[in-house]
């Protein structure tokens, strides 16, 4: 469905294509974005487990971009099949992912390995979040 198309196109092109590029009803696109955010969370967490912080960050960023798209869409709720619910759910998923990302960054910052600390600091500086430096 839409989730697979959105995800696959992102994986091949590196960005979320606009609604007009898909031959689907607006509610299918919205549902696809919402569902794909959950899939990107899984990928972000998989990369976190492997300490692939840059890859994990890229999935967090695309999740936020997906939420931005959901927030920009302005269709009546009857057409969208519950846009607000999808946006609220996506927001919660992103906040949990960001929290887990910050937890790992904090753990990495506590390491004595200078190379790891420098790499982690470069990521930390991008986020206006509560990460101990």
Model-assigned labels for residue ranges:
Residues 10-22, 40-42:
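Short, charged/polar, low-complexity loop and linker segments
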Residues 82-133:
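C-terminal accessory extensions/subdomains outside the catalytic/core fold
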Residues 9, 46, 50, 72, ...:
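Heptad-repeat coiled-coil alpha-helices
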Residues 46, 58, 65, 72, ...:
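Charged/polar, solvent-exposed surface patches and flexible loops
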Residues 23, 55-61, 111-119:
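Long amphipathic alpha-helical coiled-coil segments
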Residues 1-6:
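Short, small-residue-biased leader/transition segments that mark boundaries at the very start
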Residues 25-59, 63-66, 70:
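Surface-exposed interaction/gating patches
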